[in-house]
């Protein structure tokens, strides 16, 4: 998703992004 690129730069955001 979109959040995939953010997860690479900020691993902390992954829980608030695609994982949910």
UniProtKB/Swiss-Prot annotation:
The keyword Transferase does not apply. The keyword Magnesium applies. GO terms for molecular function: isocitrate dehydrogenase (NADP+) activity. It is found in: Cytoplasm. Its main location: cytoplasm. Keywords: Cytoplasm, Magnesium, Manganese, NADP, Oxidoreductase, Tricarboxylic acid cycle. Its cofactor is Mn(2+); Mg(2+). Its EC number is 1.1.1.42. Transmembrane segments: none annotated. One of its GO terms (biological process) is tricarboxylic acid cycle. One of its GO terms (cellular component) is cytoplasm. It comes from the Eukaryota. It catalyses: D-threo-isocitrate + NADP(+) = 2-oxoglutarate + CO2 + NADPH. On the 2D-gel the determined pI of this protein is: 6.8, its MW is: 32.3 kDa. Belongs to the isocitrate and isopropylmalate dehydrogenases family. This is Isocitrate dehydrogenase [NADP]. The lineage of its organism: Eukaryota, Discoba, Heterolobosea, Tetramitia, Eutetramitia.
């Amino acid at each position: 998703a979109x959040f995939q690129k953010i997860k690479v730069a900020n691993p902390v955001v992954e829980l608030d992004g695609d994982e949910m």
